[in-house]
Amino acid sequence: LGIKWDEGGDKGGEYGPYVQSERFELYKKYAQKLIENGEAYYCFCAAERLERIRKIQTENKMAPGYDRNCRHLTPEEVQKNLAEGKPYVIRLKVQKKKKTVFHDHILGDIVWKNEDISPDPVLLKSDGFPTYHLANIVDDHMMKISHVMRAQEWIPSTPLHVQMYKAFGWQHPEFCHLPMVNGSDGKKLSKRHGSTSLNEFRARGYLPQAIVNYVAMLGCSYEEGKEFYTLDELASLFRLEHLNKAPAVFDYKKLEYYNGNYIRQLSAEELYKWTLPFITGTGDATLEINPENPQPKPNVGPEFSG
């Protein structure tokens, strides 16, 4: 897509390492810190016990979740279990009373009952691997992430993340939960609507600048009456307040319109470069395409015969 990140695993930077498997010691360090601060605890419950709890909850139509059994172990009991080498996970002490409040740039203030947060989720597994929640919070804080922008389906996880930031004594980043991108039927965009992966769009002849331009326009407004922007223009004009609350609809015909505009701007040399894989059967044109996909291939130029 022509998007170049400032830093990363293949580029280096100030906040590495950038691969989570190289950050395990960091996650262990901060999980241990939460225990020392009384914000997390060792859980020695066996898998069989947890399965019995799940079964009871399912049979009685109860909300799923851990029963906080090990939260009440005495320091002596904890030390005894550790000395005996019992396997454990580390769980967060989720606040059980009151509410968690956070501000979202699109949805405003969101109030969440703490009793509705998953009770004391695992932060560090028995094999030393972090769960998503621990890795997410530690990575974002250590890498000085200022804004977390993600789909609205992640809202239920945010109260937990806010509590985790508070447990660490850190200021949480600003949140912006984006509405979903839907298909023409108003349902979440999926394979049944057509191509959804970059590889498929590329194999069908869509230019990177067309994809970037169209996707950037979904659910966001820029200058009135203007449709086409360069990547630099999009970056300079983007504002959080320009984002829409309502879900956007992915219109394949509109994307084809954008693609046609950028194709017509290509020089003869550029057009040759982009059409050659389709003529020779090499490069992107060899990528597998779902034959049942209703999305038609775009017209990349005049038909060839010979």
Sequence positions of predicted segments:
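A glycine-rich helix N-cap at a beta->alpha junction
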Residues: 1-16
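Secretory-pathway/luminal and periplasmic proteins that interact with or process carbohydrate-rich
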Residues: 3, 59-60, 243-245
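Short glycine-enriched loop/turn motifs at secondary-structure junctions
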Residues: 11-14, 143, 195
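Acidic-and-aromatic substrate-binding clefts and catalytic sites of carbohydrate-active enzymes
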Residues: 18-24
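Active-site cores that bind ATP or allylic diphosphates and position pyrophosphate for catalysis
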Residues: 20, 33-177, 182-189, 197, ...
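Catalytic adenosine-cofactor/nucleotide-binding cores of aminoacyl-tRNA synthetases and other
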Residues: 156, 168-306
